[in-house]
Amino acid sequence: MAKKSMIAKNDQRKVIVERYAEKRLALKKALVNPESTDEQREEARLGLQKLPRNASPIRLRNRDAIDGRPRGTLQKFGISRVRFRDMAHRGELPGIKKSSW
């Protein structure tokens, strides 16, 4: 079980990323647009620097949806590898069975 403060911090970051997503995308497009002038690129770069650090999606952490474990998370299921294995053995994941050869 992860610390509740770390789970809450990650949830708060998700909100901030969502809030600034459109503005961040517009600034990034201005940076890579070949038709924009050097002044426009400079303004876009400064605009990106003024955004909060937590507005970047890179700072988000994929966590287990049930207990918040930060590592070994399977994206397809949203749970950690440990929890996935337990749930699969108990038959709680439809369509998942242990392979044997």
Swiss-Prot record:
Keywords associated with the record: Ribonucleoprotein, Ribosomal protein, RNA-binding, rRNA-binding
Cellular component per GO, a single term: small ribosomal subunit
Regions that span the bilayer: none
GO molecular function, a single term: structural constituent of ribosome
Biological-process GO terms, alphabetical: translation
The keyword RNA-binding is annotated on this UniProt entry: yes
Keyword Ribonucleoprotein belongs to the record: yes
Family designation: Belongs to the universal ribosomal protein uS14 family.
NCBIfam families documented for this protein: PRK08881.1
Functional description taken from the UniProt entry: Binds 16S rRNA, required for the assembly of 30S particles and may also be responsible for determining the conformation of the 16S rRNA at the A site.
Subunit structure: Part of the 30S ribosomal subunit. Contacts proteins S3 and S10.
Designated name of the protein: Small ribosomal subunit protein uS14
Source organism per UniProt: Renibacterium salmoninarum (strain ATCC 33209 / DSM 20767 / JCM 11484 / NBRC 15589 / NCIMB 2235)
Phylogenetic classification of the source organism: Bacteria, Bacillati, Actinomycetota, Actinomycetes, Micrococcales
Gene: rpsN
